[in-house]
Swiss-Prot record:
Superkingdom to which the source organism belongs: Eukaryota
Keywords: Carbohydrate metabolism, Galactose metabolism, Iron, Metal-binding, Nucleotidyltransferase, Transferase, Zinc
Protein name, as recorded: Galactose-1-phosphate uridylyltransferase
Organism name: Schizosaccharomyces pombe (strain 972 / ATCC 24843)
Lineage, opening ranks: Eukaryota, Fungi, Dikarya, Ascomycota, Taphrinomycotina
Binding site for Zn(2+): C54, C57, H127, H183
Residues holding UDP-alpha-D-glucose: A63, N79, D80, N172, Q187, K332, F333, C334, V335, F337, E338
Pathway(s) this gene product operates in, as recorded in its UniProt entry: Carbohydrate metabolism; galactose metabolism
Length: 369
């Protein structure tokens, strides 16, 4: 035992994530270690508005032979290489396995068929405009497109032959996150199942409501607004925080201040405020290391089709998972203990938030050069 005061910026500790019912090991003293590992190559930013070789630019021919229209705003089309499809047979368990009474195999090797649709969402026609470089009005068009997809697919789920359950909207930005095309775009996968990560969050939010008669993320918003130290962006409708339980170095969580279950409930005010928050956050990200900041980002919201509990306990939020740790060339790797034990981070959430708080969210570094 020691009487020395516990310093969260110096000593190892675990932080609980109520959304996933799991812990993150925080080792802040490791941020001082020298780095001799792999470094990312800094690629030159695209400076052209139009690239004749890009499959996503207006008027170009895609790999499958389809021609893009000369679109002037956000453009959506079915993914030419979808991860899930509608035109496949239903999965049926092999009758011979059932009659053989092979209970061990059926117990261990569980399989479900998955049907769905995948879409590509080109944020804007300009090849060189990522979210922080787009106007707030242009980002608002992206938000409106997300909402239109959600509402349309929810209606199709209720009226069509396939009961779609979830629409996962996301963006992989930068080659460090496996993005295969530099033209600013996101994706939307619509499935007839609820994905595992989302299902886990929904389960824990439902358990929290049953135990406390209040919403998990609603309570979390109140707590973060009271403490302030992890908030990096805030407006009338949303806050963006480095979550207390963050894994990635500069991970953020965007949360609706009020109980908005999905994009379907967004009025013009919420669309404008979301666009503003996204522009400010991504501008801060780029300004952190004066680079086009890579990340994986995704929306979590109410299912297209679910139980009353699942829908009512949902709370609109967005996750941003950026890999960069110390500079534009050094990123975090989830390996070793993190794959075999539990996730681990070096700097604390509060240290990361302080870095982001001091950055300009209005002026992009490219406009200051």
């Amino acid at each position: 035992m020691t009487s020395k005061k516990f310093d969260f910026t110096e000593y190892s500790h675990r932080r609980y994530n109520p959304l996933t019912d799991s812990y993150v090991l925080c080792s802040p003293h490791r941020a001082k270690r020298p780095w001799q590992g792999a470094k990312e190559e800094i690629k030159k930013d695209d400076t052209v508005k139009y690239d004749p070789t890009c499959y996503l630019c207006p008027g170009n021919i895609r790999a499958t032979g389809f021609e893009n229209p000369k679109y002037e705003t956000t453009y959506v089309f079915p993914n030419d290489y979808p991860a899930v499809r509608v035109d496949q047979p239903d999965y049926m368990q092999d009758e011979s396995e059932i009659t053989k009474g092979n209970t061990l195999k059926t117990r261990m090797f569980k399989t479900e068929g998955v049907k769905g649709k995948c879409f590509v969402i080109c944020f804007c026609p300009n090849h060189n405009l990522t979210l922080p470089l787009m106007s707030a009005e242009a980002i608002c068009n992206v938000v409106e497109t997300w909402k239109h997809l959600y509402v349309t697919l929810k209606k199709e789920s209720l009226e069509g032959p396939i009961r779609y359950k979830y629409l996962q909207i996301f963006e992989n930005k930068g080659s460090a996150m496996g993005c295969s095309n530099p033209h600013p775009h996101g994706q939307a996968w619509c499935l007839d199942v609820i994905p595992s990560v989302v299902a886990q969050e929904m389960c824990n939010m439902t358990k929290y409501f049953e135990l406390n008669n209040s919403h998990l993320l609603g309570d979390y918003v109140k707590l973060e607004m009271l403490e302030k130290e992890r908030i990096v962006v805030e407006n009338d409708s949303f806050i963006v925080v480095v979550p207390y339980w963050a894994l990635w170095p500069f991970e953020t969580l965007l949360i609706a201040k009020e109980h908005l279950k999905s994009l379907e409930e967004f009025e013009e005010k919420q669309k404008v405020d979301l666009a503003s928050a996204l522009k400010m956050l991504t501008t801060k990200y780029d300004n952190l290391f004066n680079t086009s900041f890579p990340y994986s980002m995704g929306l979590h919201q109410a299912p297209l089709y679910g139980s009353n509990e699942e829908v009512e306990n949902s709370w609109f939020h967005m996750h941003f998972y950026p890999p960069l740790l110390r500079s534009a060339t050094v990123k975090k790797f989830c390996v070793g203990f993190e794959m075999l034990g539990e996730p681990q981070r070096d700097l604390t959430s509060e240290q990361a938030a302080a870095r982001l708080q001091e950055l300009d969210g209005q002026k992009h570094y490219k406009n200051l050069l």
